Regions:
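N-terminal export signals
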Residues: 14, 22, 39-58
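Active-site beta->alpha N-cap acidic-glycine motif
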Residues: 296-402, 406, 445, 449
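Helical hinge/lid and interdomain linker segments adjacent to catalytic or ligand-binding clefts
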Residues: 93-175
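Surface-exposed beta-strand/loop patches in extracellular or lumenal glycoproteins
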Residues: 630-647
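Catalytic grooves of carbohydrate-active enzymes
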Residues: 294-298, 320-323, 340, 500-598
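A glycine-rich, often tryptophan-bearing local segment used as a flexible ligand/cofactor-contacting loop or short
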Residues: 144-214, 218-219
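A glycine-centered loop/beta-turn motif at secondary-structure junctions
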Residues: 86-90, 104-109, 113-114, 162, ...
Length: 681
């Protein structure tokens, strides 16, 4: 194998199977300083300035002025190039620019999120028969097809290829073994059928989809999922597979990629409506009437993505056992992404949260909003700290450096009431002017204010932010008509994926939902909040963590404000009890407790990984492949291979020529052998 390349080899031996600002004493710039102390400080400041003048370097003044955010393209440029190398891979993704919008880029994002990084990409215009013959399976994004392209796909299937098409045009209906009907369903449900092998292991409840689904009548196809209402099934298929010639053709009656985007990112129509009152727009309000609160405990978008990955593996089962990457590091069943907003809180309050997280071997993200001081005020606070090192009223650069050295993230928490870009520029300048830079790559906006459908994400990506945690479960819209409060996956997901805009363009920033929010559970900031006792709030949080660990497989976002620890008293006691209960639940169920920044590093390495040279040798009964991560990391990931393939069973795995043990764990109807390996090239 190539030097330094990770090369797992699977040998299959033949055997028949049977938030408000926290006001502290620091808000008064002078505090209880005496006139004498002030004059002493002023004199010291003069000496500092004079010294700086001698050396020609006004270091303090220059640093307190702060920086403006760098600007770049917010988009994932040339997203298909990383997978355009058409060397051996089992899956070819054909993106169709005729979709409304084109969703090929987001369909590729789904494959990566599912760990099926063994794919290559081409545009529909580049479709050629000789190219298709290299791939046992073709995945086609939604959009119209001309006659020539349609005939190329027909011949590919007839000669033994497998095709999965997202909402193809009706003139291909016979290829998929269905007959088109005139009606459609908009924003409905599907039910995955346990009776079909592909449907085994999925939730029995009907699942929401968003977008338009075409109605068909079965005409020889096998039904994998059915259109439904909340109350019961409709007489129309949602997902089918049909044996045609020597191959197979599977149909999705709606655009799965766009449905997942809509489910995760909310209703674009509400974004347009709320845009008339931008100050009142908040990310969670995009989900008013959009999510079925009776289904919120199920990650509905994730389950439908898993249905696609299960279908792909099933359709390839006569060609090769398909490897994949597990969702989380070192085989963990989920993650707790631990974060907390802080509003000018003192360092000892920050330590209260960090200490509790560190006691459980975790890391934490603090999103900090300093007061919007001007340069002179920032210089005063920096100087005051220099004069009085014991002062603990304001977070200083030394605190930030020490926290980061301990593995925590100390990031920006911008106020954007004055306008999205104006707020970002101002808070970037203040944050760096206080000596807190560099600005880390993850963020949560104050009050989770949101612009447009994805405008906030677009601006953040432009400034180099790579993960957003603004999608935040809070408010009365999560209360059912009977008064019960709903908690769970309000975006339909527990997985990070990049945002996509209205034109189908992929943004260079991940959406990580925040599922567990102190404001919603112990209710200390907004009128009408549930205000559960800490024990009840822990019980609710623990139930979500348990579901994540036992089959929902999600990265649970946590918001635990720092402010209550600065307020003290009952607020601090309740916050401490709830936070400790959540952290203990994560430990009990095996969820690592990571900061958002650390989690982002893993996500980018995993999502950017590529399986290369995937080859099945039927004579030797061996599967060989290489895995190239986007970047080496000091973490582990898990690579899974089916335990059974045709009449064979996995008996031995080697990595870089050395035997390695594996553990067995099922994933939606398939039993896998999983090996944990360092993320390296």
């Amino acid at each position: 194998m190539a030097r330094g390349i990770l090369s797992p080899r699977m040998t299959l031996l033949h055997r028949k199977r049977g938030s408000p600002i926290c006001k502290t004493r620091s808000d008064d710039a002078m505090g209880n300083w005496t006139r004498r102390r002030f004059l002493k400080a002023a004199g010291a400041a003069g000496m500092v300035a004079a010294s700086a003048g001698v050396t020609g370097s006004y270091t303090l003044w220059r640093t307190v002025r702060g920086e403006l955010p760098p600007e770049g393209s917010p988009y994932v440029e040339n997203w298909g190039e990383a997978t355009a190398d058409l060397r051996e891979a089992p899956i070819l993704l054909v993106w169709n620019d005729r979709g409304t919008p084109p969703t090929g880029a987001y369909l590729a994002e789904i494959l990566r999120a599912e760990g099926l990084n063994a794919f290559r990409t081409i545009s529909l215009e580049a479709l050629r028969e000789e190219l298709l013959e290299r791939f046992p399976l073709v995945l086609l994004s939604a959009g119209s097809l001309d006659t020539t392209s349609a005939e190329v796909l027909r011949r590919y299937v007839a000669r033994g290829g497998s095709l999965i098409a997202m909402r193809p045009p009706p003139h291909l209906a016979d290829l998929f073994g269905v007959e088109p009907l005139s009606a459609q369903t908009v924003d409905g449900y599907i039910r995955i059928l346990y009776e079909h092998p592909v449907g085994r292991g999925f939730p029995p409840e009907s699942l929401q989809f968003h977008g338009t689904a075409d109605h068909y009548r079965l005409a020889g196809a096998e039904e994998i999922a059915r259109l439904a209402t909340k109350a019961g099934d409709l007489p129309f298929p949602a997902v089918t597979v049909h044996r045609s010639g020597l191959g197979k053709a599977a149909l999705w009656v709606f655009d799965l990629a766009w449905s997942v985007a809509l489910t995760r990112q909310g209703n674009p129509a509400l974004a347009a409506l709320e845009g008339r009152k931008p100050v009142e727009m908040r990310a969670h309000r995009l989900f008013r009437g959009w999510i079925d609160l009776d289904r919120i405990e199920i990650p509905q978008a994730d389950e439908q993505m898993r249905l696609l990955s299960r279908l792909i593996a099933w359709m390839l089962a006569d060609r090769l056992p398909l490897p994949r990457l597990w969702y989380f590091p070192a085989g963990a069943p989920g993650m707790l992404v631990a974060t907390g907003d802080a509003h000018n809180t003192p360092p000892d309050a920050v330590e209260e949260a960090l200490r509790r997280v560190e006691q459980r071997s975790g890391w934490f993200s603090v999103y900090y909003a300093p007061l919007p001081r001007n340069p002179a005020q920032r210089a005063w606070h920096r100087l005051r700290n220099w004069l009085e090192r014991s002062a603990a009223h304001v977070v200083q650069p030394e605190h930030v450096q020490a926290w980061r050295e301990r593995g925590h993230e100390f990031g920006i928490h911008p106020y954007v009431e004055e306008g999205l870009e104006a707020g970002w520029r101002r808070y970037w300048e203040v944050f760096t002017g206080m000596g807190y830079g560099p600005v880390p790559p993850t963020v949560r906006t104050h009050r989770v204010l949101w612009s447009g459908w994805v405008e906030t994400a677009r601006v953040q990506a432009k400034y180099g932010i790579r993960m957003n945690l603004d999608y935040y479960l809070i408010g009365p819209l999560f209360r059912k008509p009977d008064g019960e409060w709903a908690f769970g996956y309000f975006t339909g997901s527990g997985l990070p994926m990049r945002f996509v805009d209205e034109q189908g363009r992929l943004l260079a920033i991940y959406q990580q939902p925040t599922h567990l929010v102190d404001e919603q559970l112990i209710g200390w900031t907004w009128e009408g909040a549930p205000r559960f006792p800490p024990a009840k709030a822990v019980e609710i949080s623990r139930a979500l963590i348990e579901r994540a660990a036992k089959g929902a497989w999600g990265a649970i976002g946590l918001q635990a404000h720092i402010d209550p620890f600065a307020i003290g008293g009952e607020a601090a006691a309740a916050q401490a009890a709830w936070l400790e209960g959540v952290l203990d639940a994560a430990v009990a169920y095996g969820l690592p407790i990571w900061s958002a920044q650390r989690w982002l590093q893993f996500v980018e390495a995993r999502m950017g990984a590529v399986f290369q040279a995937v080859r099945w040798n039927p004579t030797a009964r061996q599967l060989r492949f290489r895995v190239i991560p986007a970047a080496p990391l000091a973490f582990q990931w898990e690579i899974g291979m089916p335990l059974e393939f045709q009449s064979l069973r996995l008996t031995r795995v080697e990595a870089d020529g050395q035997p390695i043990s594996y553990r067995e764990r099922p994933l939606r109807g398939i039993s896998y052998g999983w090996i944990a390996l360092p993320i390296r090239s």
